[in-house]
Curated annotation (Swiss-Prot):
Species per Swiss-Prot/TrEMBL record: Bordetella pertussis (strain Tohama I / ATCC BAA-589 / NCTC 13251)
Cellular-component GO terms for this entry: plasma membrane
UniProt similarity note: Belongs to the UPF0161 family.
Keyword Lipid biosynthesis (UniProt): no
Name of the protein in its database record: Putative membrane protein insertion efficiency factor
Keyword terms: Cell inner membrane, Cell membrane, Membrane
Primary localization: membrane
């Protein structure tokens, strides 16, 4: 529920305000797409933190480029981690 409330103004910006302003983002995916994905993948608080950090890096002096949302703690994160973790000390 909170995720939807946080994503709604971002979608409003993407569909109604962004076409008037023009493409200003220096990153791929755009900051608004990054924010939506971060909130969906990491939840409200961590997603907002990641989105705020990304927006803070998006300025004219930034080199920009490809900057994906980091993997979450679910199955996607386990897929990128090939080694085993110990759960108990030996």
């Amino acid at each position: 529920m909170i995720r939807r409330l946080l994503i709604a103004p971002i979608r409003f910006y993407r569909y109604f305000l962004s076409p008037w302003v023009g493409r200003q983002c220096r990153f791929t995916p755009t900051c608004s797409a990054y924010a939506i994905e971060a909130i969906e993948r990491h939840g409200a608080w961590r997603g907002l933190w990641l989105a705020a950090r990304r927006i803070g890096r998006c300025h004219p002096w930034s080199p920009g480029g490809y900057d994906p949302v980091p993997p979450g703690h679910g199955a996607g994160a386990q897929a990128c981690c090939a080694h085993r973790h110990r759960t108990e000390p030996d």
